[in-house]
């Protein structure tokens, strides 16, 4: 795939020539960044459950800015550091979560986040539940991190331990502007943060692939949850959820080849110079029962009709799922009678296809040595 044999020969030779076969970069790879402009209102404060999920379940690599509850409310050092965080995120496009240490419960004790009985802010770098390092306003050598409003001191210290992420949150408008104006070649992953399939695909498929491959271009993520919630509440301000799915060509009615049904998540698209040229849909298969009681996939993005158009699928043996028989024990039926393919079993077929898409469109080719 894309001359992988040649890549395998080039990579070690090139890396040795560029860095003299020095010690491998041991910095961690931050998981998420953002291209969405931030301000004090948009800073993401996580609660105990959210922090536990990021550290223990999703094994995310992240930056955590910590304040001390009521001790910090009227403190200039914390209000200054909030400005630092905003400027840092807007300049470096790296997500920073905010957390109140005074609300910490026993479930998070292994993170070793310090509670102070004063206003001193802190900054932590976590790789899952492992604390990579921490900085505190209490240490004179760390104070610049919390006082340099431009975020340059924070950048210098953070990047000694962490590399920039490869997954960046963007707005739907970012994608639409690229289609109409900028015409860049980009990969875009559509999710909803409340979607179970999306919670599965990122930590179990996308992130492990990125962490094990150092030749991946950035992937942009659009979280459609807010638009989905507004539509369900009957609020019509702005562009409705269904309308944005059509404009993004997620629906089959807007793009017969690369759209699927009414538009589903998780879906990843590839835009070649602003034009949608391929896509991959994770899960979202329809399961039906035959007259003899057996089950099969009655609808899937991976059909015979699409096979000639989805270029990455030819590298995967099981690339047509529509019409495939599945075992009865692999089917889950809800209390309302809805049937679906279990995540564990479906992932054996969907994960290779999704990762093949990433490898085909997001891996970059090392430049040839023409000297």
Predicted regions and their residues:
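C-terminal motif of bacterial Sec signal peptides marking the signal peptidase cleavage site
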Residues: 16-20
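Local sequence-structure signature of Cys/Sec-based thiol-disulfide redox active-site neighborhoods
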Residues: 38, 47-94, 174-222
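Thiol-based oxidoreductase modules, predominantly thioredoxin-like and allied folds used
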Residues: 45, 67, 93-108, 190, ...
């Amino acid at each position: 795939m894309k001359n992988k044999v040649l890549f395998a020969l080039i990579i070690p030779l090139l890396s040795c020539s560029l860095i003299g076969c020095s010690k491998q970069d041991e910095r961690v790879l931050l998981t998420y960044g953002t291209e969405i402009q931030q301000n004090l209102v948009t800073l993401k404060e996580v609660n105990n459950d959210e922090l536990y999920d990021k550290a223990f379940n999703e094994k995310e690599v992240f930056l955590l800015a910590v304040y001390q509850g009521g001790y910090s409310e009227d403190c200039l050092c914390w209000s200054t550091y909030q400005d630092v965080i905003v400027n840092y995120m807007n300049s470096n496009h790296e997500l920073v979560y905010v957390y109140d240490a005074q609300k910490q419960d026993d479930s998070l004790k292994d993170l070793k986040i310090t509670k102070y009985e004063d206003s001193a802010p802190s900054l932590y770098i976590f790789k899952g539940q492992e604390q990579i390092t921490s900085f505190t306003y209490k240490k004179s050598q760390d104070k610049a991190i919390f006082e340099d409003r431009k975020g340059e001191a924070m950048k210098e210290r953070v990047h000694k331990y962490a590399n920039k992420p490869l997954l960046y949150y963007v707005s739907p408008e970012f994608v639409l502007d690229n289609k109409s104006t900028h015409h860049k070649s980009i990969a875009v992953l559509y999710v909803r943060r409340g979607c179970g399939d999306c919670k599965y695909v990122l930590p179990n498929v996308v992130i492990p692939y990125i962490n094990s491959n150092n030749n991946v271009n950035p992937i942009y993520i659009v979280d459609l949850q807010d638009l989905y919630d507004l539509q369900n509440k009957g609020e019509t301000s702005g562009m409705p959820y269904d309308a944005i799915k059509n404009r993004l060509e997620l629906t089959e009615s807007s793009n017969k080849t690369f759209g699927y049904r009414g538009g589903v998540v998780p879906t990843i698209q590839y835009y070649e110079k602003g034009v949608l040229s391929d896509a991959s849909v994770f899960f979202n298969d329809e399961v039906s029962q035959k007259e003899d009681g057996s089950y099969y996939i009655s609808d899937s993005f991976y059909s015979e009709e699409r096979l000639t158009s989805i270029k990455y699928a030819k590298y995967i043996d099981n690339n047509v799922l529509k019409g495939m028989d599945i075992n009865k024990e692999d089917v889950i039926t809800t209390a309302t009678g809805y049937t679906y393919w279990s995540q564990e079993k479906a992932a054996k077929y969907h994960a290779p296809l999704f990762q093949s898409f990433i490898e085909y469109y997001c891996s970059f080719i090392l430049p040839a040595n023409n000297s």
